[in-house]
C-alpha cells in the first residue's frame, strides 16, 4: 500500500467521520 492511497483513504475516513458528527449533532444525539 503506497503513501498516496493511504493518505487518500485516511482523508475520506476523516471526512465521513466529521460528516457523521454533524448529522448526529443536528439530530440532537
Curated annotation (Swiss-Prot):
One of its GO terms (biological process) is photosynthesis. It is found in: Plastid, Chloroplast thylakoid membrane. Pfam families: PetN. InterPro entries: Cytochr_b6-f_cplx_su8_sf, Cytochrome_b6-f_cplx_su8. It is a single-pass membrane protein. Keywords: Chloroplast, Electron transport, Membrane, Photosynthesis, Plastid, Thylakoid, Transmembrane, Transmembrane helix, Transport. Belongs to the PetN family. Component of the cytochrome b6-f complex, which mediates electron transfer between photosystem II (PSII) and photosystem I (PSI), cyclic electron flow around PSI, and state transitions. The 4 large subunits of the cytochrome b6-f complex are cytochrome b6, subunit IV (17 kDa polypeptide, PetD), cytochrome f and the Rieske protein, while the 4 small subunits are PetG, PetL, PetM and PetN. The complex functions as a dimer. This is Cytochrome b6-f complex subunit 8. The lineage of its organism: Eukaryota, Haptista, Haptophyta, Prymnesiophyceae, Isochrysidales.
Amino acid at each position: 500500500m503506497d503513501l498516496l492511497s493511504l493518505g487518500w483513504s485516511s482523508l475520506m475516513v476523516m471526512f465521513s467521520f466529521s460528516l457523521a458528527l454533524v448529522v448526529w449533532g443536528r439530530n440532537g444525539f
